[in-house]
Amino acid sequence: MSESLVLLAPAANHVYAGQAGRLCAAELSLTCPNATSVAPVTVAGVEYLSIHSEDPLPPADLAAVARSSAALACFEYRGDLLAPLELPQVDVVDEDLVTIPKYRGKTNEQFTRLLLNLTLASLEGRCATRRDEGQRLAILDPLAGRGTTLECAWRAGHNGFGVEQDAKAVEALAAHVTTWLRRKHLKHSCGTHPVRRDGRSLGKRFDAKVRFPQAEPLTMGVFTGDAADSAVLWGRKTFDAVVTDAPYGVVHGSHSGASRRRSPTDLLREAIPVWAGQLRHGGALGMSWNTLGLSREHLVTILSAAGLTPLDDDLWHQFSHRVDSSIHRDLIVAVKP
């Protein structure tokens, strides 16, 4: 039996930091193929995650540790000594693409990375094959906000696509990505343009592409529009994964025609079948939500009715955590057969 210790990265959010070890342990228990157990431990007053495995961690597991939401370094535990293990370079772009933006309501970037990792680890069929071959996957966030999920997708080497009803949020995303690309001196193209179909305006679309030597470009695209209109906006395009952070209780209605006011539950009931239709077979939908407004059982029913298969065994019941007094967040992943 081999034991490895993962040193946790610091978290800026003190509430999340207190739960990061437990959440990352649950993440690695699902993403490390050869781990027999993962649990928080304290060694000489420092918190680590202990990973037990039959043999020393192979490259696939070290890659899972490297891309995990809260890992800083990894060691092989030999008696009372720690032998450093070199983690592979898994990030395609620098992490400051994700960490620079600071604004009220931003989803914690460590949690976003966790949700993305779990969703991609759950892919099946051809989607899983593309992932394992290192191909760029297509990730959709139909509640994109200012683009944390899309930026995390870029960091992981995947293409990010989104829909966001708040035009100012899309403008802020476009400004940040454009400035970041220029400051990094990366070969790129980006811009925002109006979108019209059948003689009517569908809003605006921001597109960005960054080119790398001897590698496939990374692309990003975001429409202004309603989350439930995602299939209309993206047309026939399909995605390997949908990864999104559902609204926690604020109004998230349409701006087209008369203003609609929808609860988060109403939005998800209306939009999840649309998002499920945009998934490729074997693709996965990963979502976080506020359990104080919608029970897990109700959400499982909505996902199942949309033709998805929720992953709901005990391993998936370890991610519930407090955000603040009015938000208790959990996540769920469902696969399209």
Report each predicted region and the residues it spans.
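Class I S-adenosyl-L-methionine-dependent methyltransferase catalytic core
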Residues: M1-E27, Y77-L140, A144-P337
